[in-house]
Structures are given as structure tokens and as C-alpha cells.
Amino acid sequence: MQALYKWVGFDPKKYNLRTELLAGLTTFLTMSYILAVNPDILSTTGMDKGAVFTATALSSAIGTLLIAFLAKLPFAQAPSMGINAFFAFTLVLSMGYSWQAALAAVFVEGIIFIILTIFNIREQIVRCIPKNLRFAISAGIGFFIAFIGLKNAGVIVANEATFVTLGAFTPVSTLAVIGIILSGVLITLRVRGALFYSIVACTIIGIPLGVTQIPDGFTPVSMPKSLAPTFLQFDFKALLNMDMALTIFALVFMDIFNTVGTLIGAAAKTEMMDEKGNVKNIKEAMLADAVATSVGAVCGTSTVTTFVESGAGIAEGGRTGMTAFSTSVLFIIALFLAPLFLLIPSAATTGALVLVGVLMLSSIQEVDLTDMSEALPSFITVLTMVLTYNIAEGMALGLISYTLVKLFSGQWRQVNLTLYIVSALLLLRYILM
């Protein structure tokens, strides 16, 4: 036991074991919805849902364990909400790449992230993207995720005259609306694991509605589903073009900003921050994140990143890797509960998707809307992400518009050289399309 304490940075004289374990459980409950949502999203590309569930649970366990041992911090990892939507609905369903090519892109992104972390280049990447655009990108992804949830449940449907309209009143759409309201109520009441409980409740409600289908001979516990359908399923040949290069760049910086933002935000005002305001062992935490992304791609899931829900465990008093270790153990246990999680209908996850969108939207209040040179590119970023149904297009158009507005309004010194180069490459891509 003493060896484990040392590996995770737990000092019994300084920290309370019960508090750390409770914090780990709290973190797991608040983020366990990913075990239902991620397979649901990625399976739209044709990936095997059972294999994706195993990949999700396994990569979450491994990534969180790496955080515990390398960084000794109370953070948990899992496939990113937002990037999984980018993977499925932009990269595969919109741009037309195979899911094998998308997995290859994620694997390469992880390797690049590892290199950037080892050589301390990540700071240059962070400085490349203007602060207001970072917040706008987060808000835009929030809108995008919510739109996906509503569309998949039939709450919003296609319409030739108005492009989109409200769908028909069906058991599926009804269950989705119930999930949205229930999720909102539980979060308002500050219930730990609100999204998880909402998904469970909607799955149960879906039984009499005929939405939740229970197969004959159902058993809640089984051996983990096979990884074979997704394990090492890479198509590297598809990466040899400009679109994929830009896509990998987008994945890298989304992962970096997601991780840095979560680490700094959740660790603020705790002893995990040093006197300069930096997160202790942040390099090790970033390295764990990068390795987990490549491991996740090998298993068969989209980018693994540090979850903002880790803040729930930290709020419960989690301060060391023991919190992360206990969360990791719970993800391993979840591997054997695949039948339960795979029973969850898509409509039951709509509430979680919409509420995650709402939480991500909160970053829009950080955008400086009084400065039009900042507000317009931010607005373009958010709007085009949703209207083009493409996160990458929104990011690209936001960066280009930011650079052009600053350049022609005489504020060209506010744009760094890296952003000029990136914007020029993005603009060239549109010209050559």
C-alpha cells in the first residue's frame, strides 16, 4: 500500500484517504455519461458500438491512471466531448473520410502532442490562437454538440423551405425533451452525477415508451466486448493531403486548449498551483494526455483529453493521484457492465448533449464583444460551426477573419507570425477548393 501511496503522491499525514476515494467516485459519476454518449456518437460512422464502448472505458482508465502515476494529480481523462463530434460528424460524415482514416489522424495527433510536450513547444501553440477565439471555439462546439443531440433524437429535422424545423411528436423526441428538462433540473439542484442519473432515468422511462429495447436473455454483466473491430484499424494513406494536415492541426490545438484550460481552471485556488500561478506537474499531465490519445486511437476511439468534470472531485477535496487512481478503477469495473451501457437509447443521451452544450456556451461571456475586431471573428466562428455542420470550418473561418480584420484595421501588430502563416495556409486552401 505504501508503494501505491508513493506512486500517486498520497501522504497519509497530509491527506485523508476517505476524502480522496470519495472524490474519485464523484468524478466518475459526473463523467460516466461518456460511456453511453461516446459509443452512440462514434457508431454513427459505422464503428462497432460494443468495441467503441470497450475502447472508451479502457482508454479512460489508462489515461486517468497515467495522470495518477505521472502527474500525481486528481484529474480524470476520457474521449473528449466536442472532439468526438468533430471526429464523427465533420471528419467522417461531412468530409467523407473513413473512420479508419479518422483514427489514424487521432493517432498522429497524439504523437505530435507528445513531441510538443517533451520539447515544451505547446506554449507557442497556445499563444498562436487569440484569447477571444479560444472562448468562441468552445462556445461554438457547445452549440454544435447540442444541435447534434436534438437532430439525432428527431427534435430538429430537415426542411426544404426553412432548412431545419421542429420534428414530429414521437416517443423518441418526447424522451429526448424529458431528458433535457430532467438534466437541467438536476444540475440546477447541484446533484452530483446529474447527467449520469438523467441518462439512467430516461433509459428506464424509455421502456414503456418502446424506445429502450431489452433483448431476450439480457444480463447486465458480461466479459468486456471485443476490441477486434476497431483495434489498430488505421488508414494512414488517407492522411496524405492538405485537408487532413489541417485537420490534424485542428485536433492538436483543440486537445491542447482543452487540457490546459481544464488543468488551470480546476486547479485554481488550490495547493496544486505554485506561487507563479502554474499547475504543478503540468508537463507530466500533458504528457499523460498525449499518450492516452494515441492509446485511445489504437483501441478505437477519438481524442482522449482531461475532463472538466474532474473539478467535481476536486471540489470534494481530491488533491492527489489517489483520486485519479480510484476513478480509473471504476472505469475498469465499467468494462464488465457493457450490456447495461449499450442498452441506453440515443434519445436518452440527448439531455446530456444539450446540457454539455450549455456548459460550454458559458465561455462566450469571456469574449470581448465591445471590440468589433474581436467580436466579429468570434461570432463567425460560432455561427459557421453550426451552419456548416463542421467544427473545422468554423475554426478556420474564425482564424482567417480575425487575421484579416486586424490587418486591415491597422491592428496588425496584435497578430503573431504563427497565426499569419496558419491563416495564409487556410485561405490558400479555400482559394484552391
Where are these regions (language model features)?
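Transmembrane helix-loop junctions in multipass membrane proteins, especially transporters and channels
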Residues: S43, A68, K72-A76, I121-R122, ...
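Transmembrane alpha-helix interface/packing and boundary motifs in multi-pass membrane proteins
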Residues: G63-A76, V185-R190, L251-N258, D289-C299, ...
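Helix-loop-helix junctions within the multi-pass membrane cores of secondary transporters/permeases
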Residues: Q2-N38, S59-S60, S80-F89, L93-S138, ...
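Short, hydrophobic transmembrane alpha-helix segments
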Residues: V37-K49, F69-K72, T90-M95
